[in-house]
């Protein structure tokens, strides 16, 4: 299925959008020779005739429209699973394929990652590489209890599958108070880590919502946090532990002054900012991050892609 997805995507960009093979290679993180092979195979196998014969072509069209609408460099749209319980696995598989190609072609020197089930599924399905000079960093603090979806386990797993250097961020997601946050982040070691996190070449994160589906809501928030207060202030979800409104702006809540992660302005300085999330409960926060220009690439499902485009059309 992955090979057919690559074949259809390359063929669409070449035959419909008129990109050169070199441009397609850069867009898809593949060599020009590989693009040539995919285009030839598409013709030989009948994928490309007068029109596309694969149902995956609709996803490629959605990708092109999302890139155009939101100014994205890359988009991957995976078929929406029939069972929502499989969403993390579907987005994870698509993200793994995307990251494998990006790392193989672009050879980034540093990658920053977050936490969660989508990232866990991604690293579990990656082919892997041998990049001993690469640095993998956690971009935010982690849960205080062990878990395979925790920031610490995620960054360790990415470093292992890439044979890269691992840089932990030994801090909680949230300080206990605004005063404690000021004390923690005033320490030179934390200032250096936040600065280094903002200087990675690629970031790979998922977004969180404000429903019971959210692992952040269930496990990551400080005790006694009232998620209803965040919702009342207009929060639709979080990125890097920072709760945002529908336009992608941080809401005025103490939690956003307690989170230990890069400021959004610093995060925007990362050249390649990949967000991977899908499912109806993520629609509002995905749209918010795109409106605010917080991503350069997204990996999502086809139903979410249609929602993002429809919501954008409605606001015009």
Q: Where do the protein language model's features map onto the residues?
A:
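Structural beta-sheet core signal
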Residues: 113, 136-138, 168, 275
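HTH-adjacent hinge/linker in prokaryotic transcriptional regulators
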Residues: 40-112, 123-133, 142-148
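Short Gly/Thr/Asp-enriched flexible loops that form oxyanion-binding sites at enzyme active sites
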Residues: 118-129, 215-225
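Conserved phosphate- and dinucleotide-binding cores of soluble alpha/beta proteins
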Residues: 1-11, 15-29, 34-40, 46-52, ...
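Short, well-ordered alpha-helical scaffold segments within catalytic/effector domains
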Residues: 7, 85-96, 120, 190, ...
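Short alpha-helical
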Residues: 57, 117, 121, 281-284
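Glycine-rich beta-strand-to-loop/alpha-helix junction loops that act as flexible
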Residues: 111-118, 278
